[in-house]
Amino acid sequence: MAQETNHSQVPMLCSTGCGFYGNPRTNGMCSVCYKEHLQRQNSSNGRISPPATSVSSLSESLPVQCTDGSVPEAQSTLDSTSSSMQPSPVSNQSLLSESVASSQLDSTSVDKAVPETEDLQASVSDTAQQPSEEQSKSLEKPKQKKNRCFMCRKKVGLTGFECRCGNVYCGVHRYSDVHNCSYNYKADAAEKIRKENPVVVGEKIQKI
């Protein structure tokens, strides 16, 4: 009879339609679909949520551990800040040396500034004197240009001839032999010849 019942049972497919063979023990579903079905039931009933006792125990233990570990860290940070706030002797010495050097530089700059101010005052006084001299020169009457012949007192204007003796003559009295010129032309010519033709002298023969 048992053999007949085994032969009569035909394998059935999964009731969810996934394509696998189902099992009557799992409500006609395959093993995968049955596990998913159980997970859905557990999630709907809230059985997956963790127990409150474990969460509360963890929440109580964690703050205690954090506070215990944070105390030495806070103390170490306070110690480090206090040590950093205390002035070191090396920094004090460096500050003193810098202040002394800055005071010396200030004194030298003041000493240098005094001669500079004196020089500026002297230059200002010189510049003040120069305009006064220029004004005095400008006040002097300009020399009148000679526009008349020295011999006949005729107005010559721009057509006058200025001689080397320093006088102006007309076209008639411009020659030196006419107005008895006092300029020494011979001496001037001799001087020019001396300058243009220097004397060339050979080296002296050294006697043995």
Swiss-Prot record:
Family matches, as InterPro entries: AN1-like_Znf (IPR035896), AN1_A20_ZnFinger (IPR050652), Znf_A20 (IPR002653), Znf_AN1 (IPR000058)
Binding site for Zn(2+) 1: C14, C18, C30, C33
Region (Disordered): 41-140
Zn-finger (AN1-type) residues: 143-189
Keyword tags: Acetylation, Apoptosis, Cytoplasm, Metal-binding, Phosphoprotein, Protein transport, Transport, Zinc, Zinc-finger
UniProt-listed GO biological process terms: apoptotic process; cellular response to tumor necrosis factor; negative regulation of apoptotic process; protein targeting to peroxisome; protein transport; regulation of canonical NF-kappaB signal transduction
Localization: Cytoplasm
Biological role: Involved in regulation of TNF-alpha induced NF-kappa-B activation and apoptosis. Involved in modulation of 'Lys-48'-linked polyubiquitination status of TRAF2 and decreases association of TRAF2 with RIPK1. Required for PTS1 target sequence-dependent protein import into peroxisomes and PEX5 stability; may cooperate with PEX6. In vitro involved in PEX5 export from the cytosol to peroxisomes.
Record's protein name: AN1-type zinc finger protein 6
Organism (species): Pongo abelii (Sumatran orangutan)
Gene coding for it: ZFAND6
